[in-house]
């Protein structure tokens, strides 16, 4: 026990959680997990929290509960502020920690591309806090619209612009379209169909789901338009002043709702060499996830730019699977002798996106084959239920989905605004 090395893992997302699971009962390492939240959550489903289809507890779970049977792991609540490699320590918002090995698994944050107005006024969707804020905003504005006299004022409150037509943007636009067609008329009889200003999906690429196959793109585009979603491609959001969205083609959309799903960048921290950062502020690593310029600092997941994988010379996609696989490989390497480490090589297991009820798309890698419709939807549900952290979360998610599927209704449309209090 006295000779154990201390591994500090910063970030408890897909990569960080997988690493501590693998090293949780290690005989050669003591592990400390650091996170700004005291819970892990499942990012692919936060859009369902933001629209009231799921409760936050269905996709989140306390770290300390997860770590109960991990004898070699301890949890530290705190926010990373600075790295001091020369002293093998990190500075947190509430103290400091020393390490023998540091693993950065800090994920990514919304990228506003330097636009201060968009950063200030738009509605991001990266965290559970973001999702609850978006849910409160949507429901508050729906309620406010019932009291407005002018049709143009109601329409501005009930027009939604979603920037980014990746899986998050597609899934959110689809679920908002389902809300407008099946729920609003039942719960808001004061509003007419004409009061709903529309749902716009904006993207600078030439197709929705640009990372997926052409078949999946065309199917998704067609189904979203059938839902009534207005899609504008090869166009990006230029500015937003909380009253109207200005697009790159100089089109203006009058709305108070710009939902930002248009890209991410890794977080940066004081203490790293500038040369260690690459594209998207990701830490450049070798094929073992070792950060360039350091001998005992590693990076995993969204914050890592792995330059040693020949199949992905520009780095891996910032998705769950690369993060999990990197963590698995690093955990095995840390348990091996130094001369027996294995390179990381990403194995693509496919891509999924849900569009709406009974509609989803699946691309199978290496087969040039796509699945769409009801079967893809069932696969999407299975994959996402199994991706949740434990059985209790899986059951909650399953019950929530079954309830909506049978009743075509959302159970979690409550406006809950926590009171700020100094702790």
Where would I find each of the regions flagged by the language model?
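FAD-binding core/adjacent interface of flavoenzyme oxidoreductases
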Residues: 1-4, 73-163, 259
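Beta1-alpha1 glycine-rich phosphate/pyrophosphate-binding loop at the start
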Residues: 1-76, 160, 167-211, 259
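C-terminal, flexible cofactor-proximal segment of oxidoreductases
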Residues: 322, 326-423
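Short glycine-rich anion-binding loops that position phosphate/pyrophosphate groups of nucleotides
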Residues: 15, 107-110, 173, 264-266
